[in-house]
Structures are given as structure tokens and as C-alpha cells.
Amino acid sequence: MKKKILSVLTAVAMLAALTGCDINVNYGTASSAQPQVISNPIFSIEMPADMNGTYETIVTDHNISFYDKESKEAGFGGFAFDVAAYKEPSEHMGGMDTKLGELTTKDGTLYDIVISYPSDVQFDYTNYEYNDMPANYARLYNGSENYAQTVKSVDGGEFAWGAGMHGEDLYGDVISKYVTAIKEGWDANKLEAEAMTPMVYALGEGEKNAEDRLGFAYIDTNFDGVDELLIGEITEGEGKGTFYDIYTMVDRKPAHVISGWNRNSFMLLQAGSMICNNYSGGAAENGQRFFIVEPNSPEIIPQVAFKTDEYENPDQPYFISYDYDYESGEWINWENYPKTEYEERMSNFGDFNRLDFTPFSTVMTVE
């Protein structure tokens, strides 16, 4: 029985590859008591037997999409999740995709394996709330990562869950560069030339030990499944979680995003993916500029900016801008707000993530 299923799946996958068209296939018939293996020309996924008869799939040359059968037939879409393979991160980063790992075919071709979810409700919302999904849809949607862990290369290659995602596996050369900068005492000019924060030097001035005051943290700030590297200050109180350098992965290689210093630093919001740039423009001006790190890019995506500017309006110095001018690199069209409304809008962003940075002293060898 299993060999027959695999033969049918292989034929379907070949047809999809040859025609370049989506192929609608109903899998997991209620009469079958065997797990169902769904394949395309790159990878396969095994679905448990207890899901048989509850889902449908659409298979293409590089992805497999899963639909709740009941919701789909009722006219509500039914899309639950999609697993896809991409040779280049630029083919998928920036959308709804989250990386799950990497698949290497027998001939050495490397693919990102990613998962994506619906952007809107795909079941009968007239009878169910969002957190009260139909039972079969919920099993499909909530079990998606468990099903995705069964991914296998169809040609005998390997799939590594979590590969190419975790900071400790990605940023070793960058960490080594900071260790060298601390050991050799690079000055501010050298650090700037290397696109590194001058705080590496500032935190090590005099009798201070930069390796104990500066650290690093790995965290996926933009929810694409791949960690960013944050270089921050080890401190307590309101400054805990402050960082000065951001690195991300671009086409599977580390890339520097932005640098700051003590009067132009960064903090990650506790909820969501936004980063706050806290800055001071003098005794009477300070503000917070919020942005997101663009997936697979060294660029940032500005969101909104707040500032108190007594130079411009000493009586009501509260301003908000939702308009960033990419050509000049400046926020424009600032709107003046009463203090109460300004503070209310600021409060919507919540608290900061008080990150615990790993001191560089823990990775420095004693010579």
C-alpha cells in the first residue's frame, strides 16, 4: 500500500515540475489507516494516520500547502500552513515566511525550508472565534511545526532542523572581531572604519575592562526564524538591555545593520519585533525612533518617531512623525501633540526587553 502511495505521489510531483502548475491533490482518505507521505521534487512530509480524511494539499515544484478540508469545502479558504524550499533567502525573506532549517540534496544543493501561515481567518468565523477554531483546523494549524519536522529530501539528502538559524552557529567571525578589538584596544577611528560602535573603546577606557562591560545576545528580532546579533552594554536599571550594534544575516552571511553610542542607543521592545532608537539632540531635545530590521537585508524599515523638542516649541514640545524620508534619511512632517495624547501613544509600545548579554570575557582566551 505504502509503495503505491509513494508511486502516485512521485508521479504527481513530476507532473507539477514539468507543467509548472499547481496540482490539487486530496490526501489522507478516511479509509486509509496508514500515514500519508506527500512529496514534491525536493522534499516530502509525512502526515499521521489520525489526520486522514481531514485535509487537502496543493503541491508545486517547491512547496506543499495544507488546507482543512471542511473549511475549504464550506467556502472559507481552509488554508492552514505551507512548507516550501528556496535556494536563495532573497526568494522568500520579507514575506510571511519563517525559516525552519536547511535541506541539502544529494548533489549538494542547499535549500532553506520555510513555513508560512494565513494572514486572515481561513475557517467559518461566523460560528467560531479566532481562538476557538474548528477541531480539525486547529489540529492542522497548531500541529504544523510537528508535521514540518518530518521533512525529508526525496533524493536521499539531509534535512537539518534549525540549521542556519541560531546565532551561535552564524556569527562566530563577528564575535572574534570584537574580541580582537577589545584585546588590541582599537580606538574610535579604527572602530568606525570597521563599522563597529565606538562604545567598545569607551567602555574600556582607563581602568575599565570592556570585556566585562560589553556583551552579545542572539535573538530573532523580525520573526523570520533567523537570529540577529546584538552588541550591548552589561548594566542594570533603566539601561539594562541597551545595545549599540546590530548584525543580521544577508544571503546566509553576517552583515552589519547599524551602530550607535551612548547618546544614540537601541533597545528591543518586549512585545513585537520593533527596535527603539533612543537619542538625544541636546539638553532640550530627545526622542525615540522605532524601526524593524528588514529580513535578509542590512536595511531598516522605519515605523514611527517621537520627540520632545523645546527648541521648536518650549510650551508644548511633544511631536510625532509617521513619515520617513529615505532620500534625506530624516523624519519629516512632525505633528505637535498635547502631553497626555503623546504619552498615551508612547505607552502603546509597552516596556523594553531587558536583555541579558553574554560578556565578551567568557569567550576571550587567556594568552
Predicted regions and their residues:
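Short, well-structured beta-strand
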Residues: 97-165
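Beta-propeller blade termini
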Residues: 212-221, 264-274
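Bacterial lipoprotein signal-peptidase II cleavage site
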Residues: 22-30
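Acidic, small-residue rich beta-repeat scaffolds with periodic aromatic anchors
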Residues: 37, 144-185, 278-367
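Repeated scaffold domains used in trafficking and secretory/extracellular systems
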Residues: 261-270, 312-316
